[in-house]
Structure formats: structure tokens, C-alpha cells
């Protein structure tokens, strides 16, 4: 039989000095759901993009298994990935994922900018070409001028926009290489 002793007295002063952070159950659930969504994003990545993200062995294995799973098994695997993410530092993972997503957004913005440049070249003609050559003096003026005139003729005659596409391709090749 064990002897029962007195309960240790609490030192209220030291307890008040320690900062206790209470986290509600709802907040814990929100954080867990957020980590599960992060895990789902990892599962949806391509193999090359997944290799760019710093994942430990267990997490990488769980993500690859979730890719092969279907329906209910995939849901359970996503739960497991969320659990693994709770025990790891997710900031490097989020940073790498943001870089991958932003790279895609930047590429889309660049392609949209090229489309606008092409539209401006075709609508303004030589004025647009002069403005473009100020920014990119290495471009072939004669070739671009011929493409612009061909695109304008195609537009007037309701022909397929072959030169219109060629302008875009020329801009894309030249500007993206630079």
C-alpha cells in the first residue's frame, strides 16, 4: 500500500508569470483542416514539382501512396498526411509550394502581356512597332513590319489569322529568351 502524502502546494506567483496560451478546440480543428488542404495540394502536384519541395521520407511516401489511392482510401491517406504535417515544420513546404504556384501565375501574366503587345502592334501598326522597338531594339524591324501588315490584311479579308499567330510566336520566342 502506498502512502498518501500531502498535495504539493502550488506556487501561484510563478504560475502567473508563465504565459499560458489557450487554444480553442475549433482553432485546432481549423489548423488541422488547413494542413489537410496543404496535403491535398501536395498530392495534386506533378512528380517534378513534388521533388522541389522539402519533404521527409515518411511524408513523401504518404503523398505517393495517396496519389495511387482512390475514394475512401485517398481520404484516409489525406487525413494521415495532415497528421504528419502537424508534426513537421510546414513553412519551408509552404514557401516551396508558393514558389511553384507563383511561377505558373508569372508565366500566365507574361503570356497575357505578349497577347496585349501583339494586339497593340496589329491595331496601331508602325506606331506600335516604334514603341516596341524602343523597349526591344534588337528585334528584327523588317520581319515584324511584314508580319504586322500581313496580319492587318488577313483581318480585313477575314482570312485565318496565320500572321497574327506568327507575331505572337515571334514575340514569345524573343522576349522569353531575353
UniProtKB/Swiss-Prot annotation:
InterPro entries registered for this protein in UniProt: DarP (IPR006839), DarP_sf (IPR023153)
Subcellular compartments: Cytoplasm
Gene3D superfamilies (UniProt xref): PSPTO4464-like domains
Keywords: Cytoplasm, Ribosome biogenesis, RNA-binding, rRNA-binding
GO cellular component, one term: cytosol
Pfam families: DarP (PF04751)
GO BP term, pick one: assembly of large subunit precursor of preribosome
GO MF annotations, alphabetized: ribosome binding; rRNA binding
The organism's place on the tree of life at top rank: Bacteria
Keyword tRNA-binding appears in the UniProt entry: no
Family: Belongs to the DarP family.
Function summary: Member of a network of 50S ribosomal subunit biogenesis factors which assembles along the 30S-50S interface, preventing incorrect 23S rRNA structures from forming. Promotes peptidyl transferase center (PTC) maturation.
Protein name according to UniProt: Dual-action ribosomal maturation protein DarP
Organism expressing this protein natively: Mannheimia succiniciproducens (strain KCTC 0769BP / MBEL55E)
